[in-house]
Amino acid sequence: SATSYSGPAAVRLLRASCGQLSHTNLYQPSGADCYLFENLAKLGFNQQLMLGHNGLFGDFLKELRSLGGMQSPLMDQTGLPVSLQAFDGSPVYEDLAVLNRWLKTEEASSNPRSATFYNTLPLHDGNHFPGQSKTADYKVRAQKLFDDLDNFFTELEKSGRKVMVVVVPEPGG
């Protein structure tokens, strides 16, 4: 994706079936055939949406739905541990907990095919540990993210599921 911010990058990924759109065209209506997850649903994939945050800042969740065609319900975030607070004070959930919740849901599902969109932001500028105002050390946050991903990939491999994971980093991430 040729973009430098998470909202447009997510929309570009979700509209991948129509190729790389100009930034201006990204905010114009799109045909249903452009929506990657709709096309995957036609192939029998169950759609899922997960966020490691509440999706409210910058209307991120709203943009996923209106511009990216992502209509799946947001995975339940109730009871997820909060590892950080975002620059706007909203919760940033622990990635391993979010991902493990998804894996448990998948293991209980009767559909062996799923396509899941997950957006997380523990490396975003301005994130801080709960109860502190100083931005949390980037190295500490990066190590935690990589450890969480490594632990999750280990569990995913043990599950025996056939998977493809695509990681799209954001600037600074």
Positions of predicted regions on the chain:
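Metal-dependent active-site segment of extracytoplasmic phospho-/sulfohydrolases and closely related
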Residues: 144-173
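Active-site-proximal alpha/beta segments of enzymes that process anionic O-linked groups
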Residues: 1-130, 140
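Active-site-proximal segments of metal-dependent phosphoesterases and phosphodiesterases across multiple
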Residues: 127-149
